[in-house]
């Protein structure tokens, strides 16, 4: 398998494994225990499979100890075996698996050369190759936000969008779980923007940002600067993904 094939394979198979854990153990475990079991099963599978197929590559995983040797490595897999754990624990559909390969010498956007996201409960798998154009939508701007931590600036952002695009009326907020699940909704034409100003980590946004860019969307921080990956501090304060003209309208306001 080439790297992109491997990324999609890892996303799909990890998704299958964690979905099976949820199906098998939902009745016997508490929500917290089920989330931990899914996280662990997904992480262990990724560690084992990457060791088999790419033994020289480094791994940055939400569930693993951070080996800072990755900072001098040429290839680093940035993965989240289970993004949206609380939704997974309650058997909700909006959890996902994120897989991204960062390469030091690459000229690719974000230096990410391969990426895959699966949403197991919806049987969705997306990669770097666009399936077709994203459907146009002339109605209210649909903004995906965290189901638990919506941006504190969201009222100001909505007002600016309403002023900039009056013909589209009042923006509509759509709470949802995993970043990967949110991205699939934008790619399907069911939403226009994703905004996070509450902060998260590289494994939350690396795969979604790379796939978004490959599909012609803009992914950046809230001020319009590029996202940077494989950093010593893996915290990412803000991010926005969406149609370029909508993202520009927001980043211009935030500068």
Mark where each language-model region is.
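Solvent-exposed beta-strand sheet faces enriched in polar/charged residues
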Residues: 60-62, 100, 230
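Generic detector of well-ordered alpha-helical packing
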Residues: 40, 63, 81-84, 120, ...
């Amino acid at each position: 398998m080439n790297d992109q094939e491997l990324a999609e394979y890892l996303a799909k198979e990890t998704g299958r494994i964690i979905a099976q854990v949820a199906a098998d153990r939902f009745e016997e475990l508490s929500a917290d225990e089920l989330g931990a079991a899914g996280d662990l099963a997904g992480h262990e599978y990724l560690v084992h499979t990457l060791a088999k197929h790419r033994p020289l590559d480094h791994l940055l995983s939400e569930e693993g100890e951070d080996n800072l040797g990755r900072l001098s490595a040429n290839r680093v897999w940035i993965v989240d075996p289970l993004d949206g754990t609380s939704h997974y624990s309650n058997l909700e559909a909006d959890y996902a698996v994120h897989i991204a390969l960062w390469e030091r010498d690459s000229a690719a956007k974000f230096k990410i050369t391969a990426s895959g996201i699966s949403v197991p409960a919806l049987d969705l798998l997306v990669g770097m190759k666009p399936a077709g154009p994203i459907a146009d939508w002339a109605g209210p701007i649909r903004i995906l936000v965290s189901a638990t931590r919506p941006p504190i600036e969201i009222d100001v952002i909505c007002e600016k969008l309403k002023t900039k695009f009056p013909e589209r009326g009042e923006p509509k907020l759509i709470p949802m779980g995993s970043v990967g699940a949110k991205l699939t909704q934008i790619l399907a034409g069911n939403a226009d923007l994703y905004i996070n100003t509450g902060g998260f980590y590289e494994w939350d946004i690396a795969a979604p940002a790379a796939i978004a860019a490959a599909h012609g969307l803009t992914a950046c921080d809230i001020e319009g600067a590029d996202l940077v990956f494989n950093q010593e501090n893996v915290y990412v304060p803000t991010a926005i993904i969406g149609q370029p003209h909508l993202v520009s309208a927001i980043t211009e306001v935030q500068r």
